[in-house]
């Protein structure tokens, strides 16, 4: 079943993360790892969260056997459920660097922050994609050093006064990681 997605790009900021060039010679073999993680089910109550991609436990378990991990794509998607037409839900999202002091309550004050009404009789029930512009943040989530400007998703949701017991929408984070340089460990 094909679904139309609404693309809601966050405006870019002209910044570049600092990248130390790899040593000369043959680049190490890499593995491209696609992932999708459900981060929140919304609509049953008001919610706010600040989600660090680099410290996500599911991604940490994937990267544990490698010394280096870099995001090559990243997006948040809002998926409406069957409850959405009867119970519209407000959802606000913004991608920021981890060291940003912006909070979930300040999303519309963040450059590129966006708010959506999910559901209702007039609004679209198509999934909404909010891609992370990886030039605004540092895409390296695992390295020999820890970075403080990796991607963070700010999320804020307002439910109806008479909220349903089932979620009206879910938020997932989808992307691809490039992994390289196995971490040498004992096998026994």
Curated annotation (Swiss-Prot):
Keywords, comma-separated and alphabetical: Capsid protein, T=3 icosahedral capsid protein, Virion
Parts forming coiled coils: none
Main location: virion
Pfam families associated with the record: Tymo_coat
InterPro entries: Tymo_coat, Viral_coat
Keyword S-adenosyl-L-methionine: no
Name of the protein: Capsid protein
Protein location: Virion
UniProt superkingdom: Viruses
GO cellular component, one term: T=3 icosahedral viral capsid
Family: Belongs to the tymoviruses capsid protein family.
GO MF annotation list: structural molecule activity
Function noted in UniProt: Self-assembles to form a T=3 icosahedral capsid composed of 180 copies of the capsid protein. The capsid encapsulates the single-stranded RNA genome.
